[in-house]
Swiss-Prot record:
CDD domains: NAD_bind_m-THF_DH_Cyclohyd. It comes from Chlorobium luteolum (strain DSM 273 / BCRC 81028 / 2530). This is Bifunctional protein FolD. Pathway: One-carbon metabolism; tetrahydrofolate interconversion. The lineage of its organism: Bacteria, Pseudomonadati, Chlorobiota, Chlorobiia, Chlorobiales. Its EC number is 1.5.1.5, 3.5.4.9. InterPro entries: Aminoacid_DH-like_N_sf, NAD(P)-bd_dom_sf, THF_DH/CycHdrlase, THF_DH/CycHdrlase_cat_dom, THF_DH/CycHdrlase_CS, THF_DH/CycHdrlase_NAD-bd_dom. It catalyses: (6R)-5,10-methylene-5,6,7,8-tetrahydrofolate + NADP(+) = (6R)-5,10-methenyltetrahydrofolate + NADPH; (6R)-5,10-methenyltetrahydrofolate + H2O = (6R)-10-formyltetrahydrofolate + H(+). Keywords: Amino-acid biosynthesis, Histidine biosynthesis, Hydrolase, Methionine biosynthesis, Multifunctional enzyme, NADP, One-carbon metabolism, Oxidoreductase, Purine biosynthesis.
Length: 295
């Protein structure tokens, strides 16, 4: 079985991004800038934000973090976003989720300039994705990362049956739309399964490419996968494991041990899809910089 190594690909991409940033610095005297806004204190979010800032620095991009109090009014957050929209040194704006209950997440998404929406969540970017204008939009980073893995590993997709488990706005919906686009990494017949789907296994067994993004540990078992399928595991779930120092370990939405015996190729957890998300965020930020500077 081929292991689709997202950690390795993300490291390769970091070197490519670093070279591009340095080249643009020598040409324009400027570098891409990413600003992350975090509201309140969430340990997982803080770790993720630190990782983003660290990776930005490693590739030569400017990175800043704006930390706001938990009780920040929505109006103030929107003012901060507006100032970033107008700042020519900022090419990517990301508001870390989750947000406190007094803030409307959709209002925040709408407030970000689509040209700086490097998370790919703005309705304008989603609409362009659905219409196939991929050169004029930003694609949500996790689906975009999966497409990058498919392309770099030369996985044949055209005309194949792709089954996506999950319909979230962050992964499931954009993933399904990406996989039906006329691209060399997609061009599939796509089925979407979700919590109301009856007999999910009857669909997953038909999948040439199976993408699991539901947030349920080891949900996909070997009997749900056909021999020779390509399996992409988006899930990150922490389960109890008394054999580890922490007493827990990370697993995906797929039972790796069982499914790996049948799959032709598969992403591990950790080290598969996860590392690609930040890499694609920086790639989107680079694209925003290129568009802003006519490069």
């Amino acid at each position: 079985m081929l292991i689709i190594d997202g950690k390795k690909v993300s490291l390769d991409m970091k070197e490519e991004l670093k070279a591009s940033v340095e080249s643009y610095r020598s040409i324009t005297g400027k570098v891409p800038g990413l600003t992350v806004i975090i509201v309140g204190s969430d340990p997982a979010s803080e770790v993720y934000v630190r990782n983003k800032a660290k990776t930005c620095k490693e590739v030569g991009m400017n990175s800043s973090v704006i930390e706001l109090q938990e009780d920040t009014p929505e109006a103030h957050l929107l003012e901060v976003i507006d100032s970033l929209n107008r700042d020519p040194a900022v090419h990517g704006i990301l508001v870390q989720q989750p947000l406190p209950k007094q803030i409307d997440e959709f209002a925040v998404t709408l407030a970000i300039d689509p040209a700086k929406d490097v998370d790919g969540f703005h309705p304008e970017n989603l609409g362009r994705l659905v219409m196939g204008h991929l050169d004029k939009c930003f694609v949500s980073c996790t689906p975009y990362g999966i497409l990058e893995l498919i392309g770099r590993y030369g996985i044949e997709t055209s005309g194949k049956h792709c089954v996506v488990i999950g319909r979230s706005n962050i992964v499931g919906k954009p993933m399904a739309n990406l996989m039906m686009q006329k691209l060399k990494e997609s061009n599939c017949t796509v089925t979407v399964c979700h919590s109301a789907t009856k007999d999910i296994a009857s669909y997953t067994r038909q999948a040439d490419i199976l993408i699991a993004a539901i947030g349920r540990a080891k949900f996909v078992t070997a009997d749900m996968v056909k021999q020779g399928a390509v399996v992409i595991d988006v899930g990150i779930n922490r389960i109890e494991d008394p054999t580890t120092k922490s007493g827990t370990r990370l697993v995906g939405d797929v039972d790796y041990e069982g499914v790996s015996a049948k799959a032709a190729a598969m992403t591990p957890v950790p080290g598969g899809v996860g590392p690609m998300t930040i890499a694609m965020l920086l790639k989107n930020t680079l694209h925003s910089f290129e568009r802003a500077n006519g490069l």
